[in-house]
A protein has these predicted regions:
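Phosphate-binding/switch region of NTP-binding enzymes
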Residues: 4-6, 60, 79-171
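Conserved inter-motif catalytic segment of the P-loop NTP-binding fold
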Residues: 1-84, 91, 173, 180-184
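DNA transaction DNA-binding modules
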Residues: 164-189
Length: 189
């Protein structure tokens, strides 16, 4: 299906260079990009609905970053505000039967639970079906861990190595076994 990537902190030249390094000169009409979008509650909802109507085979929308689409507010962000924002995006994804990936930043300070390092309140995670947290020990490291939590899957930690040639992350190993659907007990008999 079609993928929409809202690269709201990039420009088209950077995207073109990145795609060329990742995939060569071959393109696809299934991957769409935008470098600007309206805010949630101020037109983004309509933009995304229009995209889905024009591309009914859409399966994934990536919004990079959440902060760029947040409603403009003079109020400090609260748990309720964060929960409402993610809740609106989740309702949109559920209604359209797509996966929505919201990219967000982490704080610099360490925390007992790595997911507490996500910038903002716990409301961001409270409403989401799952979260990925990519971390490196140092900014210049070529190795990282990807911690995954979700409602419908076991927690996982993946160890990755950066592939600078393809600008991707390669899986080294998983600390926990990747999720497998349990066998149907009725089919075993």
């Amino acid at each position: 299906g079609t993928v929409l990537y809202l690269a709201l902190e990039d420009d088209y030249q950077r995207l073109q260079e990145r795609m060329s390094r990742m995939f060569g000169v071959e393109g696809t009409d299934k991957l769409r990009f935008a470098i600007c979008a309206k805010h949630l509650g101020a037109g983004l909802d309509e933009q995304l609905e229009k995209f889905i109507r024009e591309h009914p085979d859409t399966r994934l929308i990536i919004i990079d970053t959440l902060q760029k689409i947040r409603e403009v507010s003079t109020d400090a962000y609260s748990y309720a505000n964060d929960y409402e924002i993610v809740g609106k995006m989740k309702q949109f994804a559920d209604r359209n039967r797509i996966c929505l990936l919201l990219v967000h930043h982490t704080r610099k300070q360490q925390a007992g639970d790595k997911f507490e390092m996500i910038s903002g309140t716990t409301g961001l995670l409270g409403c989401a079906d799952g979260a990925f947290l990519l971390q490196k020990e140092k900014r210049t490291d070529q190795n990282a861990t990807l911690d995954i939590v979700g409602r419908d899957q076991p927690d996982q930690r993946l160890h990755l190595t950066r592939n600078m040639e393809k600008l991707s992350w390669d899986l080294d190993h998983a600390e926990t076994e990747l999720w497998k659907k349990p066998p149907d007990p009725f089919l075993k008999k």
